[in-house]
C-alpha cells in the first residue's frame, strides 16, 4: 500500500539528511562543477564543506547547476511507486532552473506532482518542511497546505555577507568591474537573497556586517521584529569559529530581544559555499508577520 505524501526538496536546504530519510522527505542533489571539469554530486558526502574549502584553498573555482533532468524524472517515477502524491519544494527559481524543470513535469503527473516556487533556500526550506509535516500530521486539508507553501516566503528574509568575493566575481554573480571596485575600497558587500540575489548596501568589513544585516532584516518587516513576531532565526556559517558563532548569536539576541532557543546554527549549503567561500555568514529570519518591503520578481 502506498504512503500518502512525499516531500521532495534539494540540497539547497539545511535539512538533516538522516532525519529526511526517516520522515518521508527526499533531498535531490544539485550539481557542482569544479574548474577542472570534475563533477561533484551535492549529496552531503562528495560535497562536505571541508572538501569545498580544501578545493578553494587549492585554487579551484566552481559552477553550479540543477539536478540533471533524467535524475529528476527517475526520482519522481520511482517515488510515485511508493507515494500517492509528491510535494516539490526546491531552491528558488531565481537561483536555479530546478523549479522550472520540475514545473514542466507537473502536467505529466497531474494530481500526483505538485511543484511550488519557494523563492527561498537554506533554513527557510528546512522550516517549510517542518511546517508541512506538522500540517499533514494534523490532517489539515491538502489545499490549505499548498496555500501555506505558496505564502511561506512572505514570512522569511535572508541576507548574506562574505569576506572574500572572488568566487562571486569569477562565477559572474558580481560583475568584474563592481568586484574590482569592492576590492579596492575594501568594503564588504551585503547581499539580500529574496527570490534571487540583490545588492543591499555595504559594511566596513566582515566584522561589522552582522549589524548591517540585522538592520536590513528589521527594515524588511517594518521594524516589527521581536520575540513575539519571530519564529526562528538561523545563522548560516561557513567555517566560522565557535567563538565567532557565539558572538553572532549574542548580536541576534541583543538586536531582536529574542530567546536564544529560537536561534539555530547551520552550515551554509555547499551549493552556496562554492561561491561565498570560507568566512562567510548569513542570517535568515522566519516570522509570523508578513514582510512589508519586498523585492519584486523581474
UniProtKB/Swiss-Prot annotation:
Domain DegV residues, every copy: 5-287
Keyword Heme attributed: no
Domain of life: Bacteria
Keyword Amino-acid biosynthesis annotated: no
Protein keywords: Lipid-binding
GO MF entries: lipid binding
Alphabetized SUPFAM superfamilies for the sequence: DAK1/DegV-like (SSF82549)
Coiled coil spans: none
Positions with a binding annotation for hexadecanoate: 65, 96
Function: May bind long-chain fatty acids, such as palmitate, and may play a role in lipid transport or fatty acid metabolism.
PANTHER family (alphabetical): DEGV DOMAIN-CONTAINING PROTEIN DR_1986-RELATED, FATTY ACID-BINDING PROTEIN TM_1468
Protein name (record): DegV domain-containing protein UU535
Source lineage: Bacteria, Bacillati, Mycoplasmatota, Mycoplasmoidales, Mycoplasmoidaceae
Amino acid at each position: 500500500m502506498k504512503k500518502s505524501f512525499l516531500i521532495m526538496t534539494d540540497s539547497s536546504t539545511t535539512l538533516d539528511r538522516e532525519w529526511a530519510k526517516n520522515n518521508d522527505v527526499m533531498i535531490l542533489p544539485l550539481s557542482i562543477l569544479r574548474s577542472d571539469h570534475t563533477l561533484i554530486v551535492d549529496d552531503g558526502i562528495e560535497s562536505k564543506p571541508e572538501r569545498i574549502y580544501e578545493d578553494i584553498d587549492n585554487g579551484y573555482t566552481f559552477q553550479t547547476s540543477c539536478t540533471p533532468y533524467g535524475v529528476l524524472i527517475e526520482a519522481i517515477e520511482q517515488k510515485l511507486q511508493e507515494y500517492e502524491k509528491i510535494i516539490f519544494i526546491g531552491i528558488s527559481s531565481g537561483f536555479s532552473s530546478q523549479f522550472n524543470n520540475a514545473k514542466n513535469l507537473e502536467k505529466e503527473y497531474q494530481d500526483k506532482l505538485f511543484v511550488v516556487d519557494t523563492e527561498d533556500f537554506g533554513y527557510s526550506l528546512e522550516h517549510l518542511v517542518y511546517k508541512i509535516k506538522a500540517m499533514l500530521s494534523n490532517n489539515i486539508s491538502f489545499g490549505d497546505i499548498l496555500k501555506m507553501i505558496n505564502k511561506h516566503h512572505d514570512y522569511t528574509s535572508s541576507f548574506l555577507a562574505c569576506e572574500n568575493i572572488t568566487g562571486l566575481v569569477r562565477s559572474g554573480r558580481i560583475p568584474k568591474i563592481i568586484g574590482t571596485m569592492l576590492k579596492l575600497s575594501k568594503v564588504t558587500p551585503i547581499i539580500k537573497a529574496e527570490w534571487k540575489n540583490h545588492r543591499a548596501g555595504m559594511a566596513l568589513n566582515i566584522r561589522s556586517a552582522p549589524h548591517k544585516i540585522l538592520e536590513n532584516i528589521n527594515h524588511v518587516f517594518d521594524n516589527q521584529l521581536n520575540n513575539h513576531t519571530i519564529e526562528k532565526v538561523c545563522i548560516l556559517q561557513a567555517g566560522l569559529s565557535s567563538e565567532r558563532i557565539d558572538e553572532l548569536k549574542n548580536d541576534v539576541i541583543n538586536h531582536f530581544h529574542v530567546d536564544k532557543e529560537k536561534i539555530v546554527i547551520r552550515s551554509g549549503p555547499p551549493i552556496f559555499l562554492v561561491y561565498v567561500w570560507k568566512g562567510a555568514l548569513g542570517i535568515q529570519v522566519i516570522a509570523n508577520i508578513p514582510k512589508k518591503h519586498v523585492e519584486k520578481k523581474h
